[in-house]
Amino acid sequence: KKGIANCLKDINNDSRPFSFIALGGSSNGSIFDGHNYTYVGSTWGKIVDILIDKKCMNPIIFIDELDKVSRTEHGKEIIGILTHLIDSTQNDIFQDKYFGNVDLDLSKALFIFSYNDVDLIDKILLDRIHRIKFDNLILEDKIIICEKYLLPELYKNFGIENIIHFDENIIKYLIE
């Protein structure tokens, strides 16, 4: 999922800056919109952090495990913030608590969500998401992805290119 999102290009065929946020176990909205600057040790939220890091206002922000947001009041706060972030009628005035009344225009940012169980996602938020459904991959597709993309990256990261090679039978065994 993340690999597909990371390959998205703009109209000039340029890659847009990409960031990843894992929601699994998140239970507080301040992860996105920060804390008031008057609190000791407070800081801005992840959205502002991404804008600063990527030095742009139109990054791709991949939010993983949307269906894992807690069902508490804090989880509802997260859902409310996410709804605001992707709602085109209001995401041009996002405010991080750390910066007070400073409006940030996120209307050019692209938010991508991944999830496993659509039934666990808030219906109001889901209504604002354009859904693309992927069918489960067959074994042959998984082998191709592993051989062409995953293994070369692992070989490079561990410095074992041209040293170790996984036979297709081993890959098949590991996948099954």
Segments predicted by a language model, with ranges:
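Active-site phosphate-binding and catalytic loops of NTP-dependent enzymes
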Residues: 16, 43-46, 90-100, 156-160
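Conserved C-terminal "switch" segment of AAA+ ATPases
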Residues: 14-15, 55, 117-127, 131-176
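Alpha-helical scaffold elements adjacent to nucleotide-binding pockets in ATP/GTP-utilizing enzyme cores
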Residues: 3-7, 31, 77-85, 124-128, ...
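AAA+/SF3 P-loop NTPase mechanochemical coupling elements
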Residues: 54-62, 94-114, 164-166
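AAA+/P-loop NTPase substrate/partner-engagement loops
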Residues: 10-42, 50, 70, 141
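Helical "lid/switch" subdomain of P-loop NTPase nucleotide-binding domains
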Residues: 4, 43-44, 59, 65, ...
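Walker A/P-loop
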Residues: 1-22, 52-53, 83, 87
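Conserved catalytic/switch belt of AAA+ P-loop NTPases
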Residues: 63-104
